[in-house]
Amino acid sequence: MAPRTDAWSSALRLLSRREYSEAMLRERLQRKGFDSDQIEHALERCRSYNYVNDERFARIRARQLLASGRAVGPALMADLRHQRIGDSIARKAINDLEEEFSQAEILKDLCQRRFPDFDFQTADDRSRRRVFNYLRRRGFASAVLFQYFSEER
């Protein structure tokens, strides 16, 4: 299969829409049918212009997920792994942002935004489980959730 454009042009087109990790960009170019030499050359050029930077991508992605409350702790690490970010880079990005974001504040904001009328003490078991599981899927530890809901009043 002969590609219509070169890998460099395709990489630029992809990066003009959104940020990619290097591994994700490599996968996208492979799906487009480019051979490994073309892909490596395109990625090298992207790195030289700083268009692809896994550290920057990990920080941006982690900041977005933390700010929105979509992932914390293990869920955040799992998301970065899913985006093909190496563990050491992901851990560094998460550690750098720990000072900026407090899990307690993220939890409080998320609960106020997502469940404004929820009261853990008066809620029935089904509602408690629903809210608790929603927050667990976002990476909050059970101990943190129990502490938050016991101090909520």
From Swiss-Prot:
Localization terms from the record: Cytoplasm
GO biological process terms, semicolon-separated: regulation of DNA repair
Pfam families given in the database record: RecX_HTH1
CC per GO annotation: cytoplasm
Main location: cytoplasm
Record key words, sorted: Cytoplasm
PANTHER family per record: REGULATORY PROTEIN RECX FAMILY PROTEIN
Entry similarity comment: Belongs to the RecX family.
Function: Modulates RecA activity.
Stated name of the protein: Regulatory protein RecX
